[in-house]
């Protein structure tokens, strides 16, 4: 698992860690998923193993972590690693990766909204953590590599700015989108967040 170094570090510091492969990811079954499945998984884990003190999410999982923490899985802190504040950032990057034109990108966004049975205002209200930030008593850690090509850092910077003094920003160099998970700076920052008096 890409989270293995972080899990080891947290456990060595005495934390109990619940890690899972999201639906249709890693060793989990399924061929397709959307953000609702990730949030359902977080809710089930919270009910069985919670309450949690920190939720850590990477990439799309970071958006799911933010959404869960803002709605049905309240926690004292969230760590967002190589993530984004809203679905639009992922849709835009997917379109850029495939060199989609504006009309095709618009159809992709519309299909996403139809799948969720929501219009744009409902998607924003439910999933945009800049326009609808975390609760005021929830701390935020944002970690992003400056050279991340799979999910550039501009949306993470918006997320950090939207949360003011309760957000800590850690920017790495040369780690990219995946290796950032095991970077020393990331591990140290997540441990510090989990051990902070606000959280414990």
Residue spans of the language-model regions?
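Hydrolase active-site cap/lid region
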Residues: 72-119
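Conserved alpha/beta-hydrolase
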Residues: 1, 7-29
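Short beta-strand/loop motif that positions the catalytic acidic residue
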Residues: 133-137, 142-144, 148
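Alpha/beta-hydrolase active-site loop
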Residues: 30-53
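Active-site nucleophile elbow and catalytic-triad environment of alpha/beta-hydrolase enzymes
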Residues: 114-133
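Catalytic histidine-centered segment of alpha/beta-hydrolase-like enzymes
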Residues: 175-185
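Conserved alpha/beta-hydrolase "acid-adjacent" motif
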Residues: 149-155
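Gly/Ala-rich beta-loop-alpha elbow adjacent to hydrolase catalytic centers
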Residues: 56-65
